[in-house]
Structure formats: structure tokens, C-alpha cells
Amino acid sequence: MLTREIIRRVREIQLRTGRQVADVLAGEYVSVFKGTGVEFDEVRPYVPGDDVRSIDWNVTARMGEPFIKRYVEERQLTIMIMADVSASQDFGSAGRSKREAAAELCALLAFSAIKNDDKVGLTLFHSEIEQYIPPRKGQKHALRVIREVLAHGLSDSEEATPKLSRWRRFLNKPAGGLPFLGELGFRFSRPLRPARESTRIATALEFLMSVRSRKSVCFLISDFLDEGYEKALVAANRKHDVIAVLISDPREFKFPSIGLVELRDAETGKVRVIDTASAGFRRDFERQSLERVESLERRLRKSGIDFIHVDASGSVVDPLVQFFRMRERRKKR
């Protein structure tokens, strides 16, 4: 992708999301995240009316008179954005790729953070950590976050690639790209992407734990075409406030009728031809795709992790607003 094109897209996203933050998200962000934590300020002598539960018994024993611990509300948050930049993020069937939707979501989060004088950081990952930008404040920094997400998109030659070729690249992921085909163990017969561009969510979460000692609000943005990351996710959520954001495309649920497709078994090498025009194939594909998302959401919620589902072809703002309002209702209980 040309640098000129990246700049154009960043400016476009900045204009669109800037208005949305000002008009829609400003109050939602503050009501959900501000004041959700406290930090230690000082120890001072107890005075009548103080909460006895705040007494510091160690200091009281040493000084011979009661002292209390004083806490103040945390006035600054750190928002950590962890964005999956593996090959499947390039897929898009409705004029916008999952990567572009993720970039717009990153912009909404980054601009909401800097508007409230909070820091925002970014980690880009696939099977490895691609890039880490430490948390900072300021609009210039927020624009860099958006630019880096977009910069890991399609190359110039790929921008002109027909949609069918994009389907081939997407289906070539080691996990099958699409759950129904992945469970069958099939992939397209010719490899089209380097293996390093698969997704390893556990690697990203372990990296987060190593670089962030203080609690952060972490948005994990991915299509979650991975396995074996649940343990790392639960561990990260104990230390941080982790929010899982699934980015999907409508075609991941409704396979197009593109005729006969030759697939190869990833383990045996056996080639099989599938008729994508078959109503039965498309029906089973849709059912298993929906079941995958429902299962993912159940597992996350059972582990105490909030879940946001963003359709790359639709509004990015609406799911975020719904999440903020859900959090606000829960906070008031």
C-alpha cells in the first residue's frame, strides 16, 4: 500500500471518527472507565468520621495511635490496543476489509482516550509480535496508532487482486480460515501466504503481561481464528481489564456460490473438489460459522471477559456504544 494512500485513509478515518467521538462516545467513555479504580495516596492520622476499614494496622502499631490509608480516584487510564494483523485481516467482501474496520475501531478508542487525557498504546501481532508502541498521550500519537494498523495491510499489487483471490488467501490460513473447512482439514491446494502470518493470540497476551506492570484497559481485536489461548487470556484478565473484540465479515457466514473449488487436506495431502453452489454445503457452512461465534462468546463470558462483535461491513460505532452502555448498567448495580 502506498504511503500516500495510507495518509489519505488516516485522514479520512480521523475526520469520520473525530466527529463520532465528539457526538456519541465522549460521555459513554467517561461514564464507563473513569473512576473505576483507586490508587494509594498517603497515610494520615485517623480523625472521627473516617472509615475504620481504612485503618493501617501496621502503622498504627508502630506509632501508637490510629492511622488510615488514604486513596484517591485514578485520574488517568492506559488504553492498550492489541490488533491482529495476520493474513485473514486483509479479507473484505463489502468494500472494507477487516483490517480497515479494525483501524477505524482503533481510531475511536484512541481519540476517546486522548480526549480524556488518557494514554493509548498499540501492539500488532500475528504468530509473533510485529510491533509495539508504548502508551502515550496526544493526537499525533493517536494518528500514529491508526497509521500503523493500516500500514500492515495489503501491498500495492494485492490491492488489485480480484475478490476470488482474496477468498483463496483467506481460506489458506492454517486453521482453515473458515471454521467449517478448518474442521474438515481442507485448504486450497496451493499455498498463498507465509506461515508466519497465522494468528497466535497467546503470544500477544504473554507480551502484554511482560511489558505492562500496571493495570490497563486492553482491547484485543482479532477474528480469533486460533486455539489454545484461553489460559493466557484468563491470566491477562486477572491483571488487566481485557475486552475481546471479534471482527468478522458477512462472507464468513455466507459462502458465495463460486462453483467448484479444489481443496487439499492439510494433513494427508488428499485433494477434494467441493461444489460451493450446493445449498447443503452453504447451509452447513453458515450453521457451523454461527456456532463458532456463539461458542467463543460463551467461553469468554464464562471466563469473565467482555465480548464485542463488530461486523466489518457495518457500523463500528454502534457495537462500541452498546458495550459502553452495558458496562455502565453493570457498574450501577
Place the predicted regions along the sequence by residue.
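Exposed, interaction-prone extracellular/peripheral surfaces
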Residues: 1-29, 45-50, 59, 68-104, ...
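A positional/architectural concept
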Residues: 33-37
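N-terminal low-complexity, intrinsically disordered segments
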Residues: 53-63
